[in-house]
Amino acid sequence: MNSTFKVVFNKARGALMVVNEATSSVQAKGTKTVIAAAVTALMAGGAMAALPSDGVITNENLKEVGTTKLTSGMGQTVTIQTNGNVSQLIEDLKAVKDAQEEAKVAALRKAFGYDKEKNHSVMVGVTGGWNLMDETTAKIAAIGLLTATQDAEVVKKFASQTGYKVDDTLNLTGGYLDQTNSFTSDRETSVIIGDVDGTSSPIVLGVVGGSNYLSVSKNNANIVQNAGSTVTINSGNVAGVVGGSLTVLSPHDISFNGEGTGAEEATRTQLFTSIESTALNIGGKANVGGFVAGHAGIATNGSKIDSEVKNGTTVNIKFNDEGLDPLDGLVVGGVAGNVVVATGKSEAKATTNGQTIVNIHNGEVMGIVGGGAAVSFDMGGTLGFLLGSGSGSATTQSDSVIMNVGAKSATAALMGGGIAVADANGKNNGSASSTAKFVELNFEGPKALNENDKVKLHKAATTYLPKFREDIKSQNFSQLVADFTGFADQVDIPGVHVANLGGGSAIARGYFVDDEATGTATANSKVDSVSMTFNGGYNVATAAGGLAVAHDKADASKAANQTNATANVDKVNLIITGGENILFTAGGLAYSTAEKRDGASLAKATANVGSAEVLVSGGTIDGLLGGGIAFDNVNGKATNAVANTESVTIEVTGGEINAANVDPITKPIQGEHAGVPSRGSHVHQVAKTLGKDGANVAILGGGVASGAGAESTIQNVKLLLNGGKVNDNVFAGGLATLGG
């Protein structure tokens, strides 16, 4: 490979061009050098891995495998039983950050590689299926890789891993895609990380159960797996898991030495991907950060992605009951459905047919979304210039979601529905929608928590939450890890379930700062029916409806309602048979805020619940609300946050209901009470008013509104106190405060 190639972006033509510098020249003016950055960075430590015949990779055979990068099974089970040291990885990543530009590639090689002593390695990109690219994209990647590494053998290994052969002039032949740019497989795919006994402790960054597909050309494609995928994580530390396929579509006009690719141009470059079903099993002695049980797709530059899981997704979390270290058994951040991202005026849609099932047997589990996640955002800047300006349209759909939360687990921030996030700037429009037909959440736990554990929980919250804010603000990642380690150790108390949401979330963020900014940011979440059952446990802060958040950065001259977040739940059933339950509402949550809290922003957050039925037959409840909660942090002249509930029926046949002890909330959260109230002051005042030092509320039939532009409405309230014991005050109506 004696030729020297360069990838450039021609502004005048609006196209990527690949030139042979030995035969062509490109004027520097009006061009920008662009090397397939994602591939090059990923490949900084070497070529793709060659899978051993038995499919098992260990520290001992990594030298024969050749690299730690981009292992693919192509239908054969891939088993990773390497060993890695998290502290070493953090130290190496810090070295990458601190390195001079010319030394960053070498630092990356060290961070994402393996040592000669065979006691530390980091695996990057493990795939049960295939690494797929169309020929144009593979050639762009090969040129970028050759430019970065100056190593022809690396390029040849890369090409072989994507099904191609490459000659000395970088001509490619072969590939896994057929003549119609499609790929179909009837083979099941499987990835296994670690072992149940924990004799291996891999570090793995990026696991895909299905296949990867990357394209920068304007070729339409179909990626179909007529079988299921399974990812099993038994030990080690794993970040970034996709149960289905991972697809990235960023179409460009491609020119090789001034000649086009010959591809027919479509109105929108389209990609369809499908898989039969997916299963994600997390257990043993593992830790997992960030998973998507279904597909993950990113559409840019005016493209369109359509993904489906034909027959459901399953997530099982069950760690070893004995022999766990204090920091084993941790899962942070996950989506049980599909995830789609759209930017650059693109469209992305994903559907999960059948049931989505999440079983949490034990461990510490935080931030799990039962439905799908749809994200549209306005990239802007240099990346926006390359990947398409403007926001996009993203949609996810789920049939039914069932989440079973076991008595041996400690959980926080579980959500039954999906999440929709829309972001837009200037004249651009961004929309996101996430829907689910039926959501069921079942919580188990002890009848009561002992007082020592309660003190331990409250102390952990007041000690570490301020530290997290400071660590993030100062970008001190190593200290954040240390503080999170201490926090996780303190809150690992079985049967504690904090911040539970029955419906989905809608988050809209607008940046419309002048009269010419006529765009919109619209996020919608919808669940037809939610059923939540609490049979036991120490359950704190539960809303059966959805969550709507609207954030705006508007000048006083803006008068259009451009930033809207709406979370809808048609029907709610909230059933409490046991446990200790603190601050429950059958309604939804609406929160609106703005960077300029001068009363001019008309960002709007709306949480709607149709009918809500609450049945209390056992356990204790400290603070039960029938309606929703609306916080307006805009200080608006108009209504910015609304929580609507059509009808509520609360029936008490057993158990005991009291006013809440809100000291754990009001003591650490004070806020600004003078002038324009802050977010903290709204929380503080509402909690104080509800609690024993305020109105001493056991049951509030209506909802809560806090802030000048907040409303909480309810049409019909029915309270049936047929049994049990109510020790404090009962109000059929609602509560309103100014928040400061």
Regions from the PLM with identified roles:
Residues 4, 8-49:
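Gram-negative bacterial Sec-dependent N-terminal signal peptides
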Residues 51-206, 211-240, 245-367, 373-584, ...:
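Surface-exposed loop/turn motifs in large extracellular/passenger domains
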